[in-house]
From Swiss-Prot:
Periplasmic side: 30-173
Binding site for heme: H127, Y131
Keyword Iron listed: yes
Membrane topology annotation: Single-pass type II membrane protein
Name under which the protein is recorded: Cytochrome c-type biogenesis protein CcmE
Gene giving rise to this polypeptide: ccmE
UniProt keyword Transmembrane helix present: yes
Main location: membrane
Cytoplasmic side: 1-8
GO cellular component, one term: plasma membrane
Region called Disordered, residue ranges: 145-173
Length: 173
């Protein structure tokens, strides 16, 4: 026969194991619904697996926006940069009215197979003269492209590291 003290200890241990298992299962299930933020530099360094949904934020790189239609739907390609790296983005749908080159955006989507393009399902554009999404602001600070004590974010159009001919060739080829 077990003493009361040992029985109480076993009950506490069993409850602890049960609670730990429940928390672990809950966190595992919750992880699949999370959408992490990444900057273009982080995407280039980490190469997230195709199909994994995450947020990509930065500045729309100058001279990279190409709009058209595909199967009757609006279709847009552009590049998002943080000043250190740029990632090509493909979006099918109507862009927000405030979307333009040199502005901050956050896109939600996943990398396509082959790790070549980010397939965005949602594009969120900057709204307001002084607004900058916090994650984009942190990525720009880390890249050394912006320090808020020196004023508004820099003109992202100055970050264009390709000629228009190179951009057109990379968008079509």
């Amino acid at each position: 026969m077990m003493s009361r003290k040992k029985r109480r200890l076993w009950i506490v241990i069993a409850c602890g194991i049960g609670l730990s298992t429940a928390v672990a299962l809950m966190l595992f299930a919750f992880r699949s619904s999370l959408s992490f933020f990444m900057s273009p530099e982080q995407v280039a360094a980490r190469h997230p697996p195709p199909g994994r949904v995450f947020r990509l934020g930065g500045i729309v790189q100058a001279n990279t926006v190409v709009m058209g239609t595909r199967n009757g739907a609006p279709y847009t390609t552009f590049r998002i940069t943080d000043g250190r790296a740029s990632i090509p983005v493909v979006y099918t749908g109507v862009l927000p009215g405030l979307f333009r080159q040199g502005q901050g955006v956050v896109t939600i989507g996943a990398m396509a197979k082959g790790d070549s393009e980010f397939m965005a399902s949602t594009v969120l554009a900057k709204h307001g003269a002084d607004y900058m999404p916090r994650d984009v602001e942190m990525a720009l600070r880390k890249a050394g492209k912006w320090n808020p004590k020196f004023g508004p974010p820099p003109n992202a159009g100055a970050w264009d590291d390709k000629s228009p001919a190179q951009i057109e060739a990379s968008n079509n080829g």
